[in-house]
From Swiss-Prot:
<comment type="pathway">
    <text>Amino-acid biosynthesis; L-arginine biosynthesis; L-arginine from L-ornithine and carbamoyl phosphate: step 2/3.</text>
</comment>
<dbReference type="GO" id="GO:0005737">
    <property type="term" value="C:cytoplasm"/>
</dbReference>
<dbReference type="InterPro" id="IPR048267">
    <property type="entry name" value="Arginosuc_syn_N"/>
</dbReference>
<keyword id="KW-0963">Cytoplasm</keyword>
<feature type="binding site">
    <location>
        <position position="174"/>
    </location>
    <ligand>
        <name>L-citrulline</name>
    </ligand>
</feature>
<dbReference type="InterPro" id="IPR048268">
    <property type="entry name" value="Arginosuc_syn_C"/>
</dbReference>
<dbReference type="GO" id="GO:0000053">
    <property type="term" value="P:argininosuccinate metabolic process"/>
</dbReference>
<feature type="binding site">
    <location>
        <position position="123"/>
    </location>
    <ligand>
        <name>L-aspartate</name>
    </ligand>
</feature>
<feature type="binding site">
    <location>
        <position position="259"/>
    </location>
    <ligand>
        <name>L-citrulline</name>
    </ligand>
</feature>
<dbReference type="InterPro" id="IPR001518">
    <property type="entry name" value="Arginosuc_synth"/>
</dbReference>
<protein>
    <recommendedName>
        <fullName>Argininosuccinate synthase</fullName>
        <ecNumber>6.3.4.5</ecNumber>
    </recommendedName>
</protein>
<dbReference type="GO" id="GO:0006526">
    <property type="term" value="P:L-arginine biosynthetic process"/>
</dbReference>
<feature type="binding site">
    <location>
        <position position="118"/>
    </location>
    <ligand>
        <name>L-aspartate</name>
    </ligand>
</feature>
<keyword id="KW-0436">Ligase</keyword>
<dbReference type="InterPro" id="IPR018223">
    <property type="entry name" value="Arginosuc_synth_CS"/>
</dbReference>
<feature type="binding site">
    <location>
        <position position="122"/>
    </location>
    <ligand>
        <name>L-aspartate</name>
    </ligand>
</feature>
<dbReference type="Pfam" id="PF00764">
    <property type="entry name" value="Arginosuc_synth"/>
</dbReference>
Length: 401
């Protein structure tokens, strides 16, 4: 029987390494796909490991700039904080991974794609909904969800089939990382009362270890896109990396969150997002300076919906594309510079300026230079309060009667 081809999203860990052997037993030729999302792994080693385990071909693709410009940027502009806290670190990368899986599958003539997600997480939904949106004819295989092995059973299978056991297998944590941040769950973190141990963190320093002197950074934006740090221009992926190091050194971006998962359970996760939280904070302040009130007040409703769509795996949905069109329209004048103080876990905006600033000091001042027409306030108040006044008059008459 001729073997079918499957493209596997490969991380180099135990689950996806075992999946190669498991898929071989199901009569598949496996093509491994590993993406460089800025997590800092030795991906050349991961690429070769896939071949040594049994893949017939192995791809390693650097998608850092694509991830930064087409995914993280939108999240920043939409101030996406799921349940007010989580900047969608993992949720943002899943549609890009799904997109590349589909592209390689079509290029290689594969009939299926596979991922290493379990049956109780959000990522299985994000991957499979995205894949269906991009190519509804591809079969999607989820080996870990199908085999339902315990960790001990999986290790035993790996040993029987000469699959290398990762040296960090004893780590209690499940970690996912990319340019936009780092997520950490499992182990002691499953107890919502337990304080996260310091070894749960990698990108940020504990407050006790951060500098006792603040550091200032000026972030330049052009049409909503961060382009400079302290006057130096960077590609967006490099700007994010640089800011991760700067803000992380000051303990910015630590998040401890009990979140409501898409699949109906609550999960406690620890996130580190120094650049994401700094950029979202700075960008919001620049919008406050440059957007008219009606747009500034309406945009958070769109942001909330965009956040939910991304979290729920609906990146490629028609609604998300439509809302993105609104989002891009709001960014045309979000150009300027924001000065941020990084200190003891905080990213504090201390100054902002823009050629499109709608702040008029002559109208806002209380000094002798005040140009605001105070006399106009009388008529404005009369008209603005008229519906409330009429309502009160009518109802007071009924009470008196």
């Amino acid at each position: 029987m001729e073997k079918k081809k499957v493209v596997l999203a490969y991380s180099g860990g135990l689950d996806t390494s075992v999946a190669i052997k498991w898929l071989q037993e199901k009569n598949y030729d496996i093509i491994a796909l590993c993406l460089d999302l800025g997590e800092g792994k030795d991906l050349a080693f991961v690429k070769e490991k896939a071949l040594s385990v049994g893949a017939i071909k192995s791809y390693m693709i650097d998608v850092q700039e694509e991830f930064a410009n087409e995914y993280a940027l939108m999240a920043m502009q939409a101030h996406t904080l799921y349940e007010g806290k989580y900047p969608l670190v993992s949720a943002l990368s899943r549609p890009l991974i799904a997109k590349k899986l589909v592209e390689i599958a079509e290029q290689e003539g594969a009939t299926a794609v596979a991922h290493g997600c379990t049956g109780k997480g959000n990522d299985q939904v994000r991957f499979e909904v995205s894949i269906q949106a991009l190519n509804p004819y591809l079969e999607v295989i989820a080996p870990v969800r199908e085999w339902k092995w315990s960790r001990e059973e999986e290790i035993a299978y790996a040993k029987e089939n000469n699959v290398p056991i990762p040296i960090n297998l004893d780590s209690p944590f499940s970690i996912d990382q990319n340019l936009w941040g780092r997520s950490n769950e499992c182990g002691i973190l499953e107890d919502p009362w337990a304080a996260p141990p310091e070894d749960a963190y990698e990108m940020t320093l504990a407050l006790e270890d951060t500098p006792n002197k603040p550091e200032f950074v000026e972030i330049g934006f052009e049409a909503g896109v961060p382009t400079t740090l302290n006057g130096t221009a960077y590609p967006l992926s490099e700007l994010i990396k640089t800011l991760n190091a700067l803000a992380g050194k000051h303990g910015v971006g630590r998040i401890d969150h009990v979140e409501n998962r898409l699949v109906g359970i609550k999960s406690r996760e620890v996130y580190e997002c120094p650049a994401a939280m700094t950029l979202i904070t700075a960008h919001k302040e620049l919008e406050d300076l440059t957007l008219v009130k009606e747009v500034a007040h309406f945009k958070p409703m769109i942001e909330q919906k965009i956040t939910e769509l991304i979290y729920n795996g609906l990146w490629f949905s028609p609604l998300k594309q439509a809302l993105n069109a609104f989002l891009q329209e709001t960014q045309k004048n979000v150009t300027g510079t924001v000065r941020v103080k990084l200190f003891k876990g905080h990213a504090i905006v201390e100054g902002r300026k823009s050629e499109y600033s709608l702040y008029d000091e002559k109208l806002a001042t209380y000094t002798a230079q005040d140009e605001f027409n105070h006399d106009a306030a009388v008529g404005f108040i009369s008209l603005f309060g008229l519906p409330t006044k009429v309502y009160s008059q009518v109802n007071q008459k009924k009470v008196e009667a």
